[in-house]
A protein has these predicted regions:
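Internal helical hairpin/lid segments
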Residues: 156-247
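Glycine-rich oxoanion-binding loops at beta->alpha junctions
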Residues: 3, 26-33, 37-62, 106
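Active-site cofactor/substrate anionic-group-binding motifs, chiefly glycine-
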Residues: 1-30
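Residue-level detector of conserved catalytic or cofactor/ligand-binding positions
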Residues: 283-289
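Phosphate/pyrophosphate-binding betaalpha-module
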Residues: 71, 75-134
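A glycine- and small-aliphatic-rich helix-loop capping segment at beta-alpha/alpha-beta transitions
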Residues: 8-13, 37-44, 84-94, 114-117, ...
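C-terminal active-site/capping subdomain that shapes the small-molecule cofactor and substrate pocket
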Residues: 232-280
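A conserved active-site cap/scaffold subdomain adjacent to cofactor or substrate pockets
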Residues: 117-178
């Protein structure tokens, strides 16, 4: 759900400001308005793939002659690691490290989408951080959901529970991933993020702007905010009108309903971000269409 504009911002930093971009591998092929980070690399941009924000901070320390920006994306699961990298950069005295933040929070997305869903399949790893209390509270608004794990057995169990409970005809919440997810979640991770980040309005690819669903660094940490550090202009991305990732994410259509699915849009040449990740429904569906 990282928007086109974020990819365009990263490309701007790389090509216009000469910044070395550190990023997770999947993000390299996500399309921007005119190109992806892979395309920018072909034009001379320095795009360095890392496995964690800590790797990006380490790279900055080892290359003091380069300005380094980590692309901080993901949800509650990955946000704490980005925060820790900023803390480490301050402790290490690095003035060449920053993060471009596009982290998102799920509760606001649930609120925005609750009227269009019968049942939410809540992501287990997110709830491992946030806990389940917010999801439980949504049942009072008539919203049903189950927390699922990530193995095939865990997913099928959660779906089976959801189907049975849905047929009972009243709002419900069931934690089907209790070995990892608790009511309170990770207080340590929550406190870290609360210390360093604050909520902001945020654009989701295919879903538009969801109020207070994004994160940004608090004022006391803003020297590590790439947008402020490089006085970046407002960049308005232009999504490909043929892309239906947003509709697929909301369950409004199947991947095969998209006119470019498996034709103009393939894992090798993705038009939408959902075709990039090997874990996405669209990517998984493509070989069997």
């Amino acid at each position: 759900v990282t928007p086109v504009s974020f990819i365009d911002e990263a490309i701007y930093l790389a090509l216009e400001k000469g910044v070395t971009i550190c990023t997770f591998g999947d993000l390299v092929r996500v399309p921007g308005t005119n190109m992806s980070l892979a395309g920018a690399r072909e034009q001379g941009a320095k795009i360095h793939v890392v496995y964690s924000p800590a790797d990006a901070e380490k790279y900055a320390g080892e290359h003091p002659d380069e300005q380094v920006t980590f692309l901080s994306v993901g949800f509650e699961t990955t946000t704490p690691a980005g925060c820790l990298s900023v803390k480490a950069a301050r402790e290490d005295g690095l003035d060449n490290y920053s993060i471009l933040v596009a982290n998102k929070t799920m509760p606001q997305a649930y609120e925005a989408l609750k009227d269009s869903a019968d049942v939410f399949l809540y992501p287990g790893h997110v709830n491992a951080i946030t806990g389940t209390r917010l999801c439980e509270a949504l049942t009072e608004e008539g919203v049903s959901g189950v927390v699922a794990g990530f193995t095939a057995k865990e997913l099928m169990t959660a779906l089976a529970v959801a189907l049975v409970k849905f047929q009972e005809g009243k709002p419900f919440f069931v934690n089907c991933y209790p070995r990892v997810v608790t009511q309170d979640g990770s207080r340590e991770a929550q406190l870290l993020v609360d210390e360093m980040m604050e909520a902001c309005d945020c654009e989701w690819r295919g879903l538009g702007v969801i109020p207070r669903s994004g994160m940004k660094l608090r004022q006391e940490w803003q020297e590590f905010d790439a947008r402020l550090k490089y006085q970046m202009p407002k960049i308005e991305g232009k999504p490909n009108p043929a892309c239906r990732c947003g509709d697929v994410l909301q369950g409004k259509c199947k991947p095969s309903d998209c006119k470019v699915f498996g034709k103009g849009c393939t894992p090798q040449h993705p038009i939408g971000a959902c075709m990039v990740s090997g874990l996405s429904l669209i990517h998984i569906s493509e070989p069997t269409r």
